Amino acid sequence: MDNKIIYLTELDSSVDKSEPFVMGIDEAGRGPVMGPMVYGCCYAPISKSTTLKSMKFNDSKKLTEQQRDQLFDKMGESNKILAYETDVITAEILSEKMLYKKPISLNVISHESAIGLIRSVLKKGVNVQELYLDTVGPPDKYQLMLKKLFPEIGKIIVSKKADSLYPIVSAASIAAKVVRDFEITNKNFDYLNIYDQDEQLSTDFGSGYPSDPLSKKWLVKNRDKVFGYPNFIRFSWKTTETAMRGACFGVDWVLENDKLKQHFQENQNDKKRFMFFKENNIENCINDF
């Protein structure tokens, strides 16, 4: 099981969890070559919909950093109205899963995170009856999968631009974005430079998106010939592979079993046995090691 990094708030004890709730889910950091991808959810009683709209949540990408921080603080102070939960999927976990022998796609990782958040909220006894999500992959297929997994939720809508259409998804988007920014800005970059503890790692890496020239420059300047990069970087991204190719040492993996057989006797029974064992009819019961 992955070591989860979770940030959350809990509803005030005065809130009746049995009344119908609306829940929204969105992510931040899907595309960057560095740092975590964060999934966030927000949930509130449907009866508080008017209050939710008055809080003026919006797509986190359309807000300034200051506006996001202010709204996030307001969310933390409003546990009689709503609560949030986030799932931080580190670059290390993304690299590990996407570089398996049978790779797990980013879409599947995203779906698993969203499903995990839904299950977490339902486990708390929250009566979620409306669920809105920003799509990952084909909306209809994703929506059908969720309806089969959660038949107890009366209404499930998966759509493009959900963070601009539904305030509850906008709130989830803000939670995900602020938590991701916090994770990045509060990293100890000296620790991340595990290859040379005396050398400070530059934090001037721009947005972290593959198209950002500053991010590309950082990847070229900070690569190690043997280890490549600290685990803050997503090794499963094509941008990382391109930056390392030709500049870092390659590794040739021997996969064929027959190349290993030359070091061992194929038939252990062919080995000469001591006379003592033969005379006493003692057999070897272990054929493998």
Curated annotation (Swiss-Prot):
Keyword Hydrolase set for record: yes
GO cellular component: ribonuclease H2 complex
PROSITE patterns: RNASE_H_2
Domain RNase H type-2: 20-249
Reactions performed catalytically: Endonucleolytic cleavage to 5'-phosphomonoester
Chain positions recorded as a divalent metal cation binding sites: D26, E27, D134
Hydrolase listed as a keyword: yes
Top-level taxon: Eukaryota
Key words of the record: Endonuclease, Hydrolase, Metal-binding, Nuclease
InterPro entries: RNase_H2_suA (IPR004649), RNase_HII/HIII (IPR001352), RNase_HII/HIII_dom (IPR024567), RNase_HII_hlx-loop-hlx_cap_dom (IPR023160), RNaseH-like_sf (IPR012337), RNaseH_sf (IPR036397)
Pfam families given in the database record: RNase_HII
BP term (GO), one: DNA replication, removal of RNA primer
Cofactor or coenzyme needed: Mn(2+); Mg(2+)
Spans through the membrane: none
Cofactor note as given: Manganese or magnesium. Binds 1 divalent metal ion per monomer in the absence of substrate. May bind a second metal ion after substrate binding.
Described function: Endonuclease that specifically degrades the RNA of RNA-DNA hybrids. Participates in DNA replication.
Entries under PANTHER family matching the protein: RIBONUCLEASE H2 SUBUNIT A (PTHR10954:SF7)
Protein's recorded name: Ribonuclease H2 subunit A
Organism from which the protein derives: Dictyostelium discoideum (Social amoeba)
Record lineage: Eukaryota, Amoebozoa, Evosea, Eumycetozoa, Dictyostelia
